[in-house]
């Protein structure tokens, strides 16, 4: 009885194994990859520049909010 149940499963597995590996996906042309590198580097540089330019303003806001918090803090006298 078990042989009858396992026979279709064995046939399907055998067919999958004999089919072989799936075909590889086509790789993009290497020339187009090399031509996109300068644009990618320029975009990365612009993003990095924008990030570094925003650091002083963010630090200023953080320090201002910290100073305001200290001004509003009321400590009881001991």
Curated annotation (Swiss-Prot):
Signal peptide: 1-26
Listed GO biological process terms: lipid transport; lipoprotein metabolic process; negative regulation of cholesterol transport; negative regulation of lipid catabolic process; negative regulation of very-low-density lipoprotein particle clearance; triglyceride metabolic process; very-low-density lipoprotein particle clearance
Membrane-spanning parts: none
Alphabetic keyword roster: Lipid transport, Secreted, Signal, Transport, VLDL
Superkingdom assignment: Eukaryota
Keyword Hydrolase among record annotations: no
Cross-referenced InterPro entries: ApoC-I (IPR006781)
GO cellular component terms listed in the entry, alphabetical order: high-density lipoprotein particle; very-low-density lipoprotein particle
Presence of the UniProt keyword Secreted in the record: yes
Gene Ontology MF terms in the entry: fatty acid binding; phospholipase inhibitor activity
Localization terms from the record: Secreted
Protein purpose: Inhibitor of lipoprotein binding to the low density lipoprotein (LDL) receptor, LDL receptor-related protein, and very low density lipoprotein (VLDL) receptor. Associates with high density lipoproteins (HDL) and the triacylglycerol-rich lipoproteins in the plasma and makes up about 10% of the protein of the VLDL and 2% of that of HDL. Appears to interfere directly with fatty acid uptake and is also the major plasma inhibitor of cholesteryl ester transfer protein (CETP). Binds free fatty acids and reduces their intracellular esterification.
Family statement drawn from the similarity comment of this UniProt entry: Belongs to the apolipoprotein C1 family.
Official protein name in the record: Apolipoprotein C-I
Gene name of the encoded protein: APOC1
